[in-house]
């Protein structure tokens, strides 16, 4: 009964009243909205061993994807943070400070590569190698070029480079190559530096706001070349942080079905824990109901390694 209730409100994001009606319709057993509201907390309370295991394995992974998304709880704005791979997910809650990022217990001291957006809150993680999400870079470039296509030709050139370089990296991985060729990397770096130089020269003597924005973006690309091109220089690193963005997308779904917010901070924290479990189980091909049934009977399912096999 607990597993089916958790499936309704945790895996399918149903409001508690609708979940109670669904339980009655499918099982013939009437349960209260209070029972449905409390099942997520009961599940979260059993998931300590899982969260410990997930954090341990994530810290062993060579590449992690990180992101954060806003969530309203207890009348205020908070954040759900994620650290994940293709097979593991760990979510936690807090504000947007570096202390809150560290509180997830995965990123502090991590020595692999973190693929992320350009948010400065991750910069203190000095033990890790950093890679910027290519999708974010493309959105920034497209937004600039859209408003001034004649004056921001460099942005189009840079976007074309990133798209082309990603195709080269994808093809190299598919062919089993360990890296791009020196010739390819030289071409990528030369194209990159040329686009940056044009962005600076075309904007530095203009006074319009779009020119200031263009200069700022060109200088950002100049200062973060290694992070932006990490996907090309290290083929184990993905082009985007979409894995992390997909992992936090259910936060928005749950928020919509919860009247726009969580009533308590503990409720939001419980959500993050249970969603970590369900997301990881799904990535391993385990049915959500099976994972929840095991949780409420013999204890949580635990991933055996960083990846299956």
Residue ranges and their predicted role:
Residues 1-309:
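Catalytic center-proximal scaffold of phosphoryl-transfer enzymes
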